[in-house]
């Protein structure tokens, strides 16, 4: 049985994520254009939710200065079997307005395989 990451477009403007090659990394995009004021904060709803396959967990985070300088980001863990709406918290640490355009990459999801080994009792006596 194939394992798939399910992405749901929750409302108009939501943009489907793109897998980077055959890697465990998926890129998410800004659904609308906006400005972040100087020293401001924006909570951006991506209008997309995901369902992580069984046996995996996802680590979702905003893209850092690799794509947009002077923006600090946060991350979240997404567990398998639960549909999670995605949001990105963006901070502007500059003295100028930052413009983010629709379609700009703003988030990434890394899938990690999770195993649950059984416990064995060990003793040195």
From Swiss-Prot:
Keyword terms: Early protein, Host cytoplasm, Host-virus interaction, Hydrolase, Nucleotide metabolism, Oncogene
Enzyme class: hydrolase
Pfam families: dUTPase (PF00692)
Motif PDZ-binding: where in chain: 122-125
Effect of residue 89 to Q: Complete loss of transformation
Main location: host cell
Protein name as annotated: E4-ORF1
Top-rank taxon, per record: Viruses
Protein task: Plays a key role in virus oncogenecity in animals. Binds and sequesters human MUPP1/MPDZ protein in the cytoplasm, preventing it from playing a role in cellular proliferation regulation. Induces cell transformation, probably by inactivating MPDZ protein.
Membership in a protein family: Belongs to the dUTPase family.
Record carries keyword Hydrolase: yes
Cystine crosslinks: none
Gene: E4
GO-annotated biological processes: nucleotide metabolic process
């Amino acid at each position: 049985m194939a394992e798939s990451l399910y992405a749901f477009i929750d409302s108009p403007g939501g943009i489907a994520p793109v897998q980077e090659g055959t890697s465990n990394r998926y890129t998410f995009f800004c659904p609308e254009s906006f400005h972040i004021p100087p020293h401001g904060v924006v909570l951006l709803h991506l209008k997309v939710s995901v369902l992580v396959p069984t046996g995996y967990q996802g680590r979702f985070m905003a893209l850092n200065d690799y794509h947009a300088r002077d923006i600090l980001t946060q991350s979240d863990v997404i567990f398998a079997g639960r549909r999670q709406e995605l949001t990105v918290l963006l901070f502007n640490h500059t003295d100028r307005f930052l413009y983010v355009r629709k379609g700009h990459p703003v988030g990434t999801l890394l899938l990690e395989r999770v195993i649950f080994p059984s416990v064995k009792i060990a003793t040195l006596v």
